[in-house]
A protein has these predicted regions:
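Structural beta-alpha unit
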Residues: 74-107, 145
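Gly/Ser-rich helix-loop-strand patches that form or flank binding pockets
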Residues: 98-145
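Small/aliphatic-rich secondary-structure junction motif
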Residues: 3-52
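Active-site phosphate/pyrophosphate- and oxyanion-stabilizing loops and adjacent acidic/basic residues
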Residues: 23, 71, 126-127
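Intrinsically disordered or low-complexity boundary/linker segments at protein termini
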Residues: 1-17, 79, 131-145
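A short acidic, glycine-rich active-site loop
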Residues: 53-65
């Protein structure tokens, strides 16, 4: 049994399976689960130094919406509020950093996201599999968990 599980979610259908797998790894003890959602920077992929204020406002709004959605997503699972993280940055990098900060034993992540992010989350899972300092459990889209 793992004592600290970091579950990375993107609000896809697979995310519920990720959380269910995390619960199983902790014998249904939500106090051992840390939940993270990473928001990509609004300016990622652009080299724009103009309109930074507008992008910052958009990014702040995206973080607020993601945080509210994350709270709603986990509301029935009773994960402590101080163990729920909404961060901005590179998905794999932020998940690894949070994993190190909380000294997680395992990361649970979906192997595919939703819509246009399907390939990106696959890339994130791959980066974590090859760069994490702890165990990584990937939950495939469509797994009945």
């Amino acid at each position: 049994m793992y004592t600290k599980v970091l579950a990375a979610v993107d609000f896809s259908e697979t995310s519920r399976s990720v959380l269910n797998a995390a619960l199983r790894l902790t014998n249904d003890n939500p106090s051992r689960i840390h939940l993270i959602h990473v928001v990509q920077p609004v300016t990622e992929g652009y080299d724009l130094k103009v309109y930074t204020e507008n992008f910052q406002a958009l990014e702040d709004e995206a973080v607020e919406q993601a945080a509210a959605r994350l709270k709603e997503f986990e509301s029935s699972d009773k994960i402590p509020a101080d163990q729920i993280y909404t961060v901005v940055g590179d998905r794999a990098g932020e998940i690894r950093r949070t994993c190190a900060d909380i000294e997680a034993d395992v990361i649970v992540i979906g192997s595919h996201g939703y819509s246009g992010q399907r390939r990106m989350l696959g890339t994130t899972a791959n980066k974590l599999l090859h760069g994490a300092k702890c165990d990584v459990l990937t939950v495939h889209a469509g797994d009945p968990t």
